[in-house]
A protein has these predicted regions:
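A domain-start/cap signature at the N-terminus of enzymes
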Residues: 1-50, 98-106, 118-127, 141-158, ...
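Short substrate-entry loop that stabilizes the transition state in hydrolases
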Residues: 37-48, 53-95, 292-298, 303-339, ...
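Alpha-helical scaffolding within the catalytic cores
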Residues: 65-74, 184-191, 313-321, 373-376, ...
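Conserved acidic catalytic loop of the alpha/beta-hydrolase fold
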Residues: 102-141, 344-361
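A conserved short beta-strand
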Residues: 165-185, 384-396, 400, 422-423
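Conserved alpha/beta-hydrolase "acid-adjacent" motif
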Residues: 205-207, 433-446, 521-524
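Catalytic histidine-centered segment of alpha/beta-hydrolase-like enzymes
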Residues: 223-225, 518-524
Length: 550
């Protein structure tokens, strides 16, 4: 159950903020230090720690401020654009007699969302144009629990195990990512070894038990939050099965993550939050290998996240960053692109050209879900800019933009691209609940027909959606001129790619489906998209083969 009303936020003289809310089983006090990051433009929530402090009594604002400052948690939270949440149970007797289920309710009321402010997520529905409630802003896959005394005992007794609750995409294992346990009076009840433990001020016997029962643990005589966080930040718990993963330290692999904010002119067709404004700010995050520009201009991939997600999300969850790292190109992930148009992306592109040494013949675009729709916008409106595109897992009707409205057309002429060839690598999950592939929706079939026509493919795509029982290919309607199956061993799935020949006997068009995949974006698919796109470069109005033939 989400928070129904906007939290009442109190602001301190130094810019820090705080608010309270009472849920069914617990009280939460959310303290938000003034951020050192441009968090109002770029959503850093995906990579931010979610600090949950299990307190022995309901903190006053002064208690919370004092704890945050003294422990130096406020400095860490400020550096990551996150908050510190103090949790106290509502039952009589505090944590000592608190029932199970409190953590599950905390997670159910915690969200990372496109819209957020002052430590809470604003659950806007862009399709119904309504606000469905509010939630504590926090990444449920980076829950760092801190307990002292009875709070630590509660964690040790109930939370060091598999916990089923509300995950990102439905029921999932939501076990804590890392637990800091200070002044325990009981031995932790081990139900799983993979929960990292920071033991603070505990007895030799308890420390021996922790060392024996848990795979990742460190020990402190007295609380040292900066040292504890250095250990905490290594970990993330991901997926429906709650797998514990170690984060890559970009500094260790000489990789740059560079957030930037720019101001763009608002185009007339903008129907997002900035409609009618003269200008608006847009954020992006660039990812590239250190010294990558030393040898000359490099390829650029413009990347667009899914609806409700963020630039960090598409870079890190899909591992596009790793593709850029492994194959030495510049990745630019655009923040909140649903509130920017294809035309505005052209202005952004010009800004990027002045900031980085970009090979203008090798500019590519890709996106997942609503980001895939943005990529289709670029194909329809600015095809002559891109050497290739890789939209994934979504489409609107041909001729519509990502607002579901008629496109302004080729460079704003009112008519969409009909004859400018752009290499396309499109993929979708075979088990997705959303319409991504031709067998799932007429608009997907029509999109494929449109691309085959624009790219002058020789295949005869004379099929109808209602005649699926007659299709030779149950997913695409027809078979490609050639077919390739590429195994993704990490996910036990297969990417099946149908390639279609164009009139010049080259292959510019690929449609792929992934077995066992729902609505998601995977590293394997992104890397294959790069392999395909990187073959091409654009020389004015002509596509040239840059690499070897398929």
């Amino acid at each position: 159950m989400s928070i129904k009303n906007v939290p009442e936020v109190q602001e301190f003289n130094n810019g820090d903020k705080i608010w309270d809310h009472t849920f069914n089983t617990f009280h939460a006090k959310v303290y938000i230090p003034k951020s050192k990051l441009p968090g109002d433009i770029i959503n850093f929530g995906y990579s931010a720690p979610y600090f949950l402090i299990f307190t022995d009594f309901i903190f006053t604002n002064e208690n919370a401020l004092s704890y945050a400052k003294t422990s130096k948690l406020s400095e860490i939270a400020s550096a990551y654009d996150t908050s510190i949440v103090f949790i106290n149970p509502l039952n009589a007797g505090g944590w000592k007699s608190a029932p199970e289920g409190i953590f599950e309710e905390i997670i159910e009321n915690s969200k990372i969302h496109q819209y957020h402010k002052d430590g809470y997520a604003i659950l806007n529905n862009r399709f119904t144009h309504t606000t469905e409630g509010y939630a504590i802003r926090g990444a449920i896959f980076r829950t760092f629990l801190i307990g002292n005394g009875d709070g630590a005992d509660y964690i040790a007794k109930y939370l060091l195990k598999k916990i089923t609750g509300a995950g990102l995409w439905g029921p999932a294992d939501i076990a804590p990512t890392v637990c800091l346990l200070e002044n325990l009076s009981i031995k932790p009840l081990k139900k799983r070894r993979d929960i990292p433990i920071i033991s603070v001020g505990n007895s030799k016997l308890i420390n021996e038990t922790i060392s024996e029962k848990f795979d990742n643990c460190i020990f402190q005589e007295s609380l040292d939050i900066p040292a504890a966080f250095k250990f905490m930040k290594q970990f993330i718990r991901w997926g429906w099965d709650g797998e514990l993963l170690r984060e890559i330290d970009f500094n260790e692999v000489n990789f740059i993550e560079e957030p930037c904010v720019v101001e763009l002119k608002t185009s007339p067709d903008n129907q997002g939050d900035y409609a009618g404004s003269v200008t608006h700010k847009t954020g992006f995050i660039s990812y590239y290998n250190k010294n990558v520009f030393d040898k000359g201009p490099v390829p650029l991939v413009l990347c667009f996240h899914g609806g409700g997600d963020s630039a960090k999300h598409i870079a890190l969850v899909s591992s596009w960053w790793k593709v850029a790292h492994d194959h030495n190109f510049l990745l630019v992930c655009v923040e909140d692109h649903l509130n920017s148009t294809a035309t505005e992306m052209m202005e952004l592109l010009e800004i990027l050209k002045t900031k980085y040494r970009i090979d203008e013949k090798r500019i590519y675009a890709s996106g997942f879900s609503m980001g895939g729709c943005k990529t289709w916008d670029l194909y329809q409106e600015y095809p002559d800019v891109f050497a290739a595109v890789a939209p994934m897992d979504a489409t609107f009707d041909v001729g519509c933009n990502l607002y579901g409205q008629p496109s302004v057309g080729l460079h704003g002429c009112g008519k969409i691209n009909e004859n400018i060839l752009v290499p396309v690598f499109y993929t979708g999950g075979e088990e997705t609940p959303l319409p991504e592939l031709p067998f799932q929706a007429e608009k997907c079939r029509a999109r494929m027909e449109y691309v085959l026509k624009v790219n002058e493919c020789t295949a005869n795509y004379n099929i109808k959606f209602e005649d699926q029982n007659k299709w030779e290919n149950k997913i695409w309607g027809i078979n490609g001129d050639s077919v390739e199956k590429i195994e993704d061993k990490s996910r036990n799935s297969v990417l099946t790619i149908n390639y279609f020949n164009s009139k010049d006997e080259n292959i510019y068009t690929a449609f792929g489906s992934i077995s066992g995949q729902g609505h998601e974006c995977r590293y394997h698919t992104c890397e294959q998209a790069w392999f395909f796109m990187s073959r091409f470069q654009r020389n004015k109005d002509k596509i040239e083969i840059h690499n070897c033939q398929l």
